[in-house]
Amino acid sequence: MKNTYYITTPIYYVNDVSHIGHAYTSVASDVIARFMRCCGKDVMFLTGTDEHGQKVEKAAINKNIDPQSFTDKTSQNFRDLMVAMNISNDDFIRTTENRHKKAVAVFWQKLLDNGAIYEGFYEGWYSVRDEAFYDESEITEDKLAPTGAPVEWVKEPSYFFNLAKWQDKLLEFYELNPDFVRPISRRNEVISFVKSGLKDLSISRTTFNWGIKVPNNEKHVIYVWLDALVNYISALGYPDQQSNYSKFWPANLQVVGKDILRFHAVYWPAFLMAAEISPPKSIMVHGWWTNAGQKISKSLGNTIDPITLIDEFGVDQVRYFLMREVIFGADANFTRNNLITRINSELSNKIGNLLHRIVSFVYNNNDAKVPLIKSGVIDKIYELPILKTAMKFAQENILLMDKIEINKILENIINLAEDANIYIANEAPWNLKKTDYDKMLEVLYTLLEVLRYVAIMLQPFVPSSANKMLDQLGVAKEERLFKHLVRDHALKAGSNILEPSIIFPKI
């Protein structure tokens, strides 16, 4: 069984600056990538920017600059977001890069050689904002797409992809791969759409210039979504079989928002099948963040700047909130009050205060060392309910991540911290110092060990803060994987701890 794990975000469209929706997608994908690294997987994590299409060309014209200069600047906004959010992507693909253009040309030729592309004439509804074609039945009386985007009637020569031919093959694929689209509500949505009947898809445009030209026919620009979807393999070195392409494809998980589900769950696997390439193993679809109940979107002008939030609250605090506040796949409403409550109630009170109390007590009362207790006593400590809970959560969290139940993992970690707060209150080591010194050492060791579990499990979510916690506890850098959450890697009795510092200050 391959020990590799390939995860992608959608590549972000560069017609405006990044917002909290992009931050959420990126952090969720980053948490999964970091989690898999903590499981010992060889991870490839890709993100990037989608830089072609009519919408980008119009945005550049409106700013009176050429499209390449426009995309250079706006793509950098997304790179800056990745740095600000502490995103651990292994690569950042831009669709204006030569490596991508070459891969798209090869992919197009493969489709052409396999008889999946033919020339014709397109007449129908098109949304520039969505960069998507819509059927007459999907358009409202006000000439709006289902997304609320305006549409225009387009008439132009076009190349077509024979999508209708793949209807039965797609339905068979969904049947054989029940986890291809998750959650199940989105899977049902996709199956319903495909069963309603697929029509061949226009995959080139002639009414604008900013895009990858069709090989041997430069009057046509390749449809931006066909171009964009190929990024997931172009970044791996497709079609070179000696590259990361053969190592990592098919992707284990592709994370997308519900607004681009059709492109990823219908068009993308059909394109790949036609090119004789395996589809990704799973597509995980998340919901939208809302602001006063309205989708947060650059098109609607109600965005929340994640950089501003980071500057005010801290990167790990914002990351934690985004992952804790919502069930992955559902919509969530952003409020500052909820953000502050999560930070103060959970990060500061339940985890930060616990760490500071225990490390301070050990630092001041045990010569800054992990209590020197015997191996047999550590065995006894591992029989305590609180350590059994810690070990149970460590195993359970891996199963939860398989189902992408991210908020439940955090719930387990918070519950463990709450158990530790109850344990310290009940055992009162400050009293034991006077009455039973050996028992005090056992209690302190137990609490330090529980904190080791909490910190290691927190790493994918709040990486900087979790590593500071582990530094304070004296946990070696090479002993911070999930496989170390066992008795054999318990804190070494007598090892040094660092001077305590506040990691999660109260807001």
Curated annotation (Swiss-Prot):
NCBIfam families: metG, PRK12267.1. It catalyses: tRNA(Met) + L-methionine + ATP = L-methionyl-tRNA(Met) + AMP + diphosphate. This is Methionine--tRNA ligase. GO terms for biological process: methionyl-tRNA aminoacylation. SUPFAM superfamilies: Anticodon-binding domain of a subclass of class I aminoacyl-tRNA synthetases (SSF47323), Nucleotidylyl transferase (SSF52374). ATP binds at residue 298. It comes from the Bacteria. Is required not only for elongation of protein synthesis but also for the initiation of all mRNA translation through initiator tRNA(fMet) aminoacylation. One of its GO terms (molecular function) is methionine-tRNA ligase activity. The gene is metG. A motif ('HIGH' region) lies at residues 12-22. Monomer. It is found in: Cytoplasm. Belongs to the class-I aminoacyl-tRNA synthetase family. MetG type 2B subfamily. InterPro entries: Anticodon_Met, Met-tRNA_synth, Met-tRNA_synth_2, Methionyl/Leucyl_tRNA_Synth, MetRS_core, Rossmann-like_a/b/a_fold, tRNAsynth_Ia_anticodon-bd. Disulfide bonds: none annotated. It comes from Rickettsia typhi (strain ATCC VR-144 / Wilmington). Keywords: Aminoacyl-tRNA synthetase, ATP-binding, Cytoplasm, Ligase, Nucleotide-binding, Protein biosynthesis. Its EC number is 6.1.1.10. Its main location: cytoplasm. A motif ('KMSKS' region) lies at residues 295-299. One of its GO terms (cellular component) is cytoplasm. It is an enzyme of class 6 (ligase).
